[in-house]
Amino acid sequence: MKKIIYLLLLVTAFHTSCKKSSTEGGTETPTNPTTDLPAGAKDGVAFINNGTSAIVTLYAPGKTSVLLIGDFNNWSTTASIMKKTRDGNTWWIQIDNLNPSTEYAYQFYVDGKLKVADPYCEKVLDPDNDQYISAAVYPNLKAYPTGKTTGIVSVMQANQPIYTWKNNSFVRPEKNNLVIYELLIRDFTTEHTYASTLAKLDYLVNMGINAIELMPVNEFEGNLSWGYNPSFYFAADKYYGTKTALQNFIDECHGKGIAVIMDMVLNHSFGQSPMVQMYFDGSKPTANSPWFNVDAKHPFNVGYDFNHESAATKKFSKDVIKFWMQQYKIDGFRFDLSKGFTQTQSSGDDVFRKYDAGRVAIWKDYNSYIKSIDPNNFYVILEHFAEESEEKVLADDGMMLWNNLNYNMNEATMGWLTNSNFQWGFYANHGFSKSENLVSYGESHDEERLNFKNITYGNASGNYSIKGNLATSLKREELAAAFLFAIPGPKMIWQFGELGYDVNIDFNGRTGEKPIRWEYYSDPNRKALYNAYTKFIRLKKNNSIFNSTSSTYSLAGGIKYIKLVEGANTVIVVGNFDVVNQTANIDFGSSGTWVDASGTNISLNSNNYTASLAPGEYHIFSKVALR
């Protein structure tokens, strides 16, 4: 009898051990032990023992098993079983015998069926898109582990190349004096790299630009993208260059007096995100996702909508914010689709844009967190477009709001006057107490190029035609720019707007690559527009009157003017946006000599200025000569 019992025990033990030694196609998920996180652990990878060991963690509540696979265990799906914390939310493992100078590719193997990269990794390898990144753009890129795994893999390295910062005393421009240049690395130079963009930096410096707003540069899906389809938030997208190349770009900008603002997309993520993939039913996020809503809460969403009231989302977003502030020394964020940071359901913008106390609380919390990291004039810019009462609360908290003047300003440049009033550029019309909180622009990446519409749809009268006439359409751009830069507050330019870029936004698809037209700079008419921008920017930055809190204006009709008063000086910008001669009749406030920024003077016998202005003619008058 004892022999029979012993034999049964032996068979049972053998059968059990066979079940536990599953392979990648095994029949049973391995058992994961439960234990607390060790000291020094953090989300993602924490290196210890001088880089010869790493503690790797993954936040994945509700999962039954997680294994770590990678170069260090020959991608075995049985060798590195991760431990689970007692609350069941976080998985971790320590791996040893690493070479601190070696890059190791790795993934998480979740529930015996899903391989995902590390959401906190600083570099990924993409089997589909890396092949199109040249060695000139990204030297010595680690090869993808073909044949050993599938999907995007993360990369860890203890002794990463360390960038030594040179310009540590950079002082950010005051918000009111910001002249921001919105820039897409992909379409700025043919090489589409940080290095090639740096080679053009003096072009921006000479124009007077003091801030560059980079369209998204963290890892996004594919290579040829605007970047608003993010997948990995801590990894710089390799299509533009290496991590140190981006750090050097920012450092060199600081050395030239230029702040760098990063376009950050935390409203949503896309399907390559491991955070999406881990809680996904094949068509949408599942209800137990720690980060995402099953269905988007608002009508403007693309990708998968973050649940912005989730504690997990808030922690992740703050980790992303802190990382870029500290690792890359950026000077500000432009938060894409900030109005989407809501859990209030809406199906149309009439509801979506209404005052949302929950959304306000979310943004005040993030703004406070940013200030706790860097209180030194760090820029928080929102693409919000919500109800004015909500934007005022955010502005009063120190945040800056995008202000789109494209439609009305373009109507003015085309000479169609009915809807040409762009008084929305003045902060008081938003209820704001300070002009520094309103970032006004005539063009952005999202809007049609002014000069395309000038040439295609411009008005005409007699021998004066905007449509089809490049020289005239460019002068209309100059006219509008004189007014834009006279409005108090920070301003933004979309790349090549200063040269009258006139390629349709929908050419090659809205987000598709656009022709890079550096030859514009050699065209005398386009160069004249660049020179005019340079002049207007210089006037704005050198003369505090352009931030005056005392302003009057008339921006409807053909004759438009802006009047600014500061102390003993008055500036009046006047121009004719009609396509026929018009007579200006404006109260200048005093008689005597007035200085035209063109270099000539006029003398008034009374307070009134009366003059016939030709189509497109403008003047910048001041009582005291401007610098």
Model-derived segments and spans:
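C-terminal beta-strand-rich structural cap/linker in extracellular carbohydrate-active enzymes
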Residues: 66, 605-627
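Substrate-binding/active-site clefts of carbohydrate-active enzymes
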Residues: 124-134, 138-143, 161-178, 184-358, ...
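Bacterial Sec-dependent N-terminal signal peptides
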Residues: 1-4, 13-45
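Conserved alpha/beta catalytic core and glycan-binding cleft of carbohydrate-active enzymes
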Residues: 329, 356, 363-506, 541, ...
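Surface-exposed beta-strand/loop patches in extracellular or lumenal glycoproteins
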Residues: 53-62, 66, 577-591
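Aromatic-rich carbohydrate-binding modules that target alpha-glucans
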Residues: 38, 47-50, 55-103, 111-132
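Aromatic- and carboxylate-lined catalytic core of secreted/periplasmic carbohydrate-active enzymes
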Residues: 488, 517-554, 615-617
